[in-house]
Amino acid sequence: MMNNIHLDKILILDFGSQYTQLIARRVREIGVYCELFPYDVDSEFIKKLNPKGIILSGGPDTVTLDNAAKAPSIIFDLNIPILGICYGMQTMAIQLGGRATSANKHEYGFAKVRVRNHSPLLSDISDEGHGLLDVWMSHGIEVEQLPNGFKLIASTDNCNIAGFANVEKHYYGLQFHPEVTHTKQGERILERFISGICQCEKNWTTDNIIAKLVQNLKDQIGNANILLGLSGGVDSLVVAVLLQQAVGKQLTCVFVDNGLLRFNEGNEVMQIFAQNMDMKVIRANAHKKFYDALLNENEPEAKRKIIGRAFIEVFEEEAKKLDNIQFLAQGTIYPDVIESADAKYGKAKLIKSHHNVGGLPNDLQFKLVEPLKELFKDEVRKISVKLSIPPHIIYRHPFPGPGLGVRILGQVKQEYANILRQADAIFMDELHKNNLYDTVNQAFAVFLPIKSVGITGDERRYDYVIALRAVETIDFMTARWARLPYDFLDLVSNRIMNEISRISRVVYDVSGKPPATIEWE
């Protein structure tokens, strides 16, 4: 009998912390399903979701201000456990009758917390056997008075109330961040809350997820036929294998060669499927359609929507050649949904639309199938391992659905795409040659439509700029720019400027996510 992977769930209310997605990943790593919503999500929706526990994230607001973000009051009437982290702890304290104030000493970075009094959350958890925890702090406000019914459970030298609890109601607050790796016992603390206090069963496992996804696809598609928009990346490949298991020959994959692919990528994708996948794949050449559609468009959001519409038009054209195509499948994953602020997520602010979420037309002729829509990237990769997808495909760097269309800043021209393809190929070639490809999670080149002065021999040149980007990340929700060796960057830069006639300058992107996104557009 299949376990219900959604039976026990945790609701995470996001107050804007850069660590909120880490909370979600930690909960799922424990083996429990969770969903992330903005803090001001509709109260009726919360009741309908029926979570077994709620986590209030940190956030950048100053909780003592009149207009500070507050948790929906309904959560305190549901008789379920609540864990407030950092800002979440502060707003919980104020909303339940306590007080917060500016801290005498702000705490940013490592701190030592002393566990105090007995509580189901922290008892018998320590790093040094003396009730001390090495934790990560990030706050300038602190709780100064506990609400009625609460007791102190943790403190630091600079923060008297670093943790509190109302054990009877199962309400807990932590001023530190258990979700970050810097808090050594963070995973144990979260597991104590989720498994012990919320009493969630660990049904969110890779095997259970696969079984549920395949069954859902069978139920949803029935005897109809389905198209899969194939990119060659791990997300769409996982969807392809799941669909093959669910509906077999009812699946047709369409690989759109749109002129915005990496060097030789079209041939490589077709070769991957010929060698590893026993399924029908159609290659649609749509260079002209995409370039014509993008002509004279500079705005990133508009480009994404144009590309989304063009993909759908190609799928519709191919569907007319086949019988009974009622469904279109895509490899949309949870970060795509979060960043696009899908309508399901209420009042979340748009970061950027993804061509397969916010970029789809309203008059879509297919029923949309997105089996990975609830999954983070690392969860998709775990599934791909279980499905025996070859490792060189699983760990291939991600490539955005809009392709080079969002790596060429501003207007997309075929000339720009050809230059960028060459630069990106040189970057990838050297990453492989120097055994650096697998040390970063994503790397690529970006074309900047600006010209910079350079020198070739004794002659002045005035040509375009290429930016190189490489990041280290687990879930692609947060990322650290990769510290590639200077000698390596020097080698790549020289090759690009010597081998591509229209490039006079190469720069390296040293922006993390946040505040930047991984892609430039």
UniProtKB/Swiss-Prot annotation:
Gene3D superfamilies: 3.30.300.10, 3.40.50.880, HUPs (3.40.50.620). This is GMP synthase [glutamine-hydrolyzing]. Keywords: ATP-binding, Glutamine amidotransferase, GMP biosynthesis, Ligase, Nucleotide-binding, Purine biosynthesis. ATP binds at residues 231-237. It is an enzyme of class 6 (ligase). Its EC number is 6.3.5.2. It comes from the Bacteria. Homodimer. The active site is at residues 86, 177, 179. GO terms for cellular component: cytosol. It catalyses: XMP + L-glutamine + ATP + H2O = GMP + L-glutamate + AMP + diphosphate + 2 H(+). Pfam families: GATase, GMP_synt_C, NAD_synthase. The gene is guaA. Pathway: Purine metabolism; GMP biosynthesis; GMP from XMP (L-Gln route): step 1/1. Catalyzes the synthesis of GMP from XMP. The keyword ATP-binding applies. Residues 9-203 form the Glutamine amidotransferase type-1 domain. GO terms for molecular function: ATP binding; GMP synthase activity.
